[in-house]
Swiss-Prot record:
Predominant subcellular localization, coarse grouping: mitochondrion
Keyword vocabulary terms for this entry: Electron transport, Membrane, Mitochondrion, Mitochondrion inner membrane, NAD, Respiratory chain, Translocase, Transmembrane, Transmembrane helix, Transport, Ubiquinone
The enzyme's E.C. designation: 7.1.1.2
UniProt record similarity statement: Belongs to the complex I subunit 5 family.
Reactions catalysed: a ubiquinone + NADH + 5 H(+)(in) = a ubiquinol + NAD(+) + 4 H(+)(out)
Annotated compartments: Mitochondrion inner membrane
PANTHER family named in the record: NADH-UBIQUINONE OXIDOREDUCTASE CHAIN 5
UniProt protein name: NADH-ubiquinone oxidoreductase chain 5
Length: 670
């Protein structure tokens, strides 16, 4: 049963890929959706047996690589962390498959699309179930490849091509860091198996001094692993690919942002918690990076006009919350927020897809407005998702986001306070852009064309069913799972993840945190909603004043241009590497030294020599006699010296040189 959870999506993808031409769009959609749905049902059974029954399951299938000290096998690990991720991935993926049946019904390449969705799901399941770093890396690279194929699905669009290449290249930076971290684990522990590495993590580690700094082997490995998470989970510095990934179909965006790809980095940190717990330096770095990411993405999203990009930046901001929750050693709360976030983020993306699908692929919110009457169901769904996103009391997001902020405050460290205040301010911006999205899309006077309004319609039944199910999850999952997953004294995470006793602060955040810290997120959410209402619906004079102010214009450009991260990366990194690649690698090395000293240079030298020799052929007898004399003289001299030279000159080399010279001379004459 456990193996079927992983391999059923692979079966559906294989059938869609090899027989999609014969099954057609409907047959392929039914096959892939059925396989992923069965996998989702089996995930619920596994959740009952493993998480609720507190019995982890280890499956060792077959040996994979065995070379001296290196031994890797095909194995699967099903513990509490794994089964939670299985439910998230398979449930969201099955709803996205069902949604795509209607959304992609008019696309002639829908069988290929369903094939890509299923293989994406398979690689994510392979990532979360692997019991060693090598298998995790296989799934890690697989989801990167599948995301490239899905973002690049409409390959005739230039922006989709550029976005897919950008996602692939930016993620290669993080993948390189993850690979170095895995190499470091093997060097230090002589294995890539999770259980062995985690059991030995507390043993004495190697330390050395570099640039007057004391470095620890575990710290270095954790930093390298975190670089992998920075790339995959779109943290500050490597986050630029995430908004551009919106060029793919909307179901792809929902799957990437809710259940797969971006959650892989958070999962990897939670899985490697026994390593990170013994590296306080790495935890501090993770906390600062996550807090800065949440603030950066929240401030960037407030002035975006693309419907999907606003939701994409909200994903980036929420990933920052998950990351700095891991940095303060509360991996269970981070995974809980990941699960809650999957429901309302998939709901937001699929609701946005319903609007875009009905509005003839229009994504600019400024060209919408007044759609609440035409899309009552979609408006209600997006309202529920937005309220859950901002942490409205008693909705799903409220039970995880507020706990993360309380934990950051009760950490009583510089990094914890930094994360608390940046996270709290990010709540204000999150509330602002969430309600701005609702106002500009559904409530302001209409700005769309009349012909678009005549054709628009609410979500059809196949698209409405996933929205309703996700809305129920956005309303009740946090309340139902809170006590089980992050309640005091719960045994849910008995086998994974691991937290040192000195880092346990959940009880302190529950009872020792001041009341004001519990009210700050609610106050900021209310303030953000009120500000969005006043700016976008009421105060036209505020907008005019904002447009005429030089400072406000510069601030608008700064946030709208995404803190100029793309420009900085292009000017200082991309163009520098392009210049280096052309002037040094191409001109100086490839077309320079390698060609001159390589085969081209040797052939050119012999060819020029043969041309000079051929000029001696003048047709005069005395010239030939003189040439014979010049040729015989060194020959006679050389034959006399042969006995002394034969000890260090190879006669075979001399023969080869003589014959090659003759052939080159003959070819030059022809």
């Amino acid at each position: 049963m456990y193996l079927l959870i992983v391999f059923l999506p692979l079966l559906g993808s294989s059938v869609a890929g090899f027989f999609g031409r014969f099954l057609g769009s409907e047959g392929t959609a039914i096959m892939t959706t059925t396989c992923v749905s069965f996998s989702s049902i089996l995930s619920l059974i596994a959740f009952y047996e493993v998480a609720l029954g507190a019995s982890a399951c280890y499956l060792r299938i077959a040996p994979w690589i065995s070379s001296e000290m290196f031994d890797a096998s095909w194995g699967f690990l099903f513990d509490s962390l794994t089964v939670v991720m299985l439910i998230v991935v398979t449930f969201i993926s099955s709803l996205v498959h069902l949604y795509s049946i209607s959304y992609m019904s008019e696309d002639p390449h829908s069988p290929r699309f369903m094939c890509y969705l299923s293989i994406f799901t398979f690689f994510m399941l392979m990532l979360v179930t692997g019991d060693n770093f090598l298998q995790l890396f296989l799934g890690w690279e697989g989801v990167g490849l599948a995301s490239y194929l899905l973002i690049h699905f409409w390959f005739t669009r230039l922006q989709a091509d550029k976005a897919a290449i950008k996602a692939m290249l930016v993620n290669r930076v993080g993948d390189f860091g993850l690979a170095l971290g895995i190499f470091g684990c093997f060097t230090l522990f002589q294995t890539v198996d999770f259980s062995t590495i985690f059991a030995c993590a507390s043993a004495p580690r190697n330390e050395w001094i570099f640039c007057n700094m004391r470095l620890n082997a575990i710290t270095l490995i954790c930093i390298l692993l975190f670089i992998g998470a920075v790339g995959k989970s779109a943290q500050i510095g490597l986050h630029t690919w995430l908004p551009d990934a919106m060029e793919g179909p909307t179901p792809v965006s929902a799957l990437i942002h809710a259940a797969t790809m971006v959650t892989a980095g958070v999962f990897m940190i939670a899985r490697c918690s026994p390593l990170f717990e013994y590296s306080p330096t790495a935890l501090i770095v993770i906390t600062f990076a996550g807090a800065m990411t949440s603030f950066l993405a929240a401030t960037t999203g407030i002035l975006q006009n693309d419907l999907k990009r606003v939701i994409a930046y909200s994903t980036c901001s929420q990933l920052g919350y998950m990351i700095f929750a891991c940095g303060i050693s509360n991996y269970s709360v981070s995974v809980f927020h990941l699960m809650n976030h999957a429901f309302f983020k998939a709901l937001l993306f699929l609701s946005a897809g319903s609007v875009i699908h009905a509005m003839s692929d229009e994504q600019d919110m400024r060209k919408m407005g007044g759609l609440a009457s035409s899309f009552p169901l979609t408006y209600a769904m997006m309202l529920m998702g937005s309220l859950s996103l901002i942490g409205f009391p008693f909705l799903t997001g409220f039970y995880s986001k507020d706990v993360i902020l309380e934990l950051a405050y009760t950490k009583y460290t510089i990094s914890g306070n930094f994360a608390f205040w940046l996270g709290s301010v990010s709540v204000l911006f999150t509330s602002y852009y969430s309600f701005r999205l609702l106002f500009l899309t559904f409530l302001v006077p209409t700005n769309s064309f009349g012909r678009d309004r005549l054709r628009c319609h609410d979500a059809p039944i196949p698209m409405a069913i996933p929205l309703i199910l996700l809305a129920l999850g956005s309303l009740f999952v946090g309340y139902l799972a809170k006590d089980m997953m992050i309640g005091l004294g719960t045994n849910f995470w008995a086998n994974s993840p691991f937290v040192l006793p000195k880092n346990e602060i959940l009880a302190e955040s529950e009872f020792a945190a001041p009341t004001i810290t519990k009210l700050i997120p609610i106050l900021f959410s209310t303030s953000g909603a009120s500000l969005a209402y006043n700016v976008n619906l009421v105060a036209d004079q505020f907008q005019r004043a904002f447009q005429t102010s030089t400072f406000c214009n510069r601030l608008y450009s700064f946030f709208n241009k995404r803190w100029f991260f793309d420009q900085v990366l292009n000017d200082f990194l991309v163009r520098s590497f392009l210049r280096f690649g052309y002037s040094v690698s191409f001109e100086a090395l490839d077309k320079g030294a390698i060609e001159i000293l390589g085969p081209y240079g040797i052939s050119y030298t012999f060819r020029r020599l043969a041309e000079r020799i051929s000029q001696l052929q003048s047709g005069s007898v005395y010239h030939y006699a003189f040439a014979m004399l010049l040729g015989s003289t060194p020959f006679v001299t050389f034959s006399r010296m042969w006995d002394s030279l034969s000890s260090w000159v190879d006669s075979r080399s001399s023969f080869i040189l003589l014959v090659s010279s003759f052939l080159i001379n003959k070819s030059s004459q022809e």
